[in-house]
């Protein structure tokens, strides 16, 4: 994967090549980086063009300026598409990546071929009670991280992945997360309940692991109720980061979603 820095931004992105007609955009979870999708890169690189990014404050996207925040991610992604002459992308987002995928689709629906969100929730219909519960949990996590990133990463891997291999891989990425990068997440709430979901002109796949927290399973259920036309995938023997826990099942599910939607 070739790494490129987007001019006038903190964002580094990665491209596999241009040999195919369709593009996939992978957006990773919080506290890790684009390498959480390494199994997907291996599987899809000879079928699709791959674009992956490091979210602001993560991986190689830490060269920030005053005023930079996560609320600018959609704008930066759109700039990348313009620079690379990419008209449309199949977006795959996991956890925080699922939030950013939806925010991008809210702003630039005509740049979306399809959207697949895992371990996420419908950002256009967030239950305030759920948001408060989520916020309280995030504050506890931040306190742990500020005390010790290693301690935080040890705790975080248990709720982020189910299999031991995926937990270890998550930990190895999480431990590299800089404490100062928490500040860039502060504007995340600006994406919540800002848009009304209209009729999507692209297919939607949502899902999570069967061992994810009950609140996530409920979020997927509620999202399906509000968008009955979407496809749902619940992955057995997987936790939050389903693409890391069960990569083969994940890859096949996503590929089937794209080919059957054509």
Tell me what each language-model feature is.
Residues 126-128, 145-199:
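Conserved alpha/beta-hydrolase catalytic His-Asp/Glu region
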Residues 1-25, 46-48, 86-87, 255-262:
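Alpha/beta-hydrolase fold catalytic core
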Residues 230-262:
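Catalytic active-site module of serine/aspartate enzymes centered on a nucleophile-bearing elbow/loop
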């Amino acid at each position: 994967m070739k790494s490129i820095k987007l001019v006038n931004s903190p964002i580094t992105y990665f491209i596999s090549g241009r040999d195919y007609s369709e593009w996939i955009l992978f957006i990773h979870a919080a506290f890790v980086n684009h390498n959480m999708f390494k199994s997907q890169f291996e599987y899809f690189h000879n079928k699709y063009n791959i674009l992956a990014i490091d979210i602001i404050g993560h991986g190689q996207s830490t060269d920030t300026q005053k005023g930079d925040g996560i609320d600018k991610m959609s704008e930066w992604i759109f700039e990348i598409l313009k620079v690379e002459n990419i008209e449309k992308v199949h977006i795959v987002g996991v956890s925080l990546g699922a939030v950013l995928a939806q925010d991008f689709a809210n702003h630039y629906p005509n740049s979306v071929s399809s959207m697949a969100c895992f371990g996420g929730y419908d950002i256009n219909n967030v239950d305030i009670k759920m948001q408060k519960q989520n916020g309280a949990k995030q504050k506890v996590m931040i306190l742990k991280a500020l005390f010790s990133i290693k301690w935080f990463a040890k705790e975080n891997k248990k709720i982020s992945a189910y299999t031991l291999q995926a937990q270890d891989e998550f930990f190895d990425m999480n431990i590299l997360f800089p404490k100062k990068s928490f500040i860039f997440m502060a504007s995340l709430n600006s994406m919540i309940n800002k848009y009304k979901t209209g009729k999507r002109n692209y297919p939607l796949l949502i899902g999570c692991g069967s061992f994810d927290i009950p609140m996530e399973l409920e979020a997927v259920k509620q999202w399906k109720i509000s968008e009955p036309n979407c496809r749902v995938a619940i992955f057995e023997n997987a936790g939050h980061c389903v693409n890391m826990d069960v990569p083969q099942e994940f890859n096949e599910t996503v590929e089937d979603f794209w080919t059957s939607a054509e």
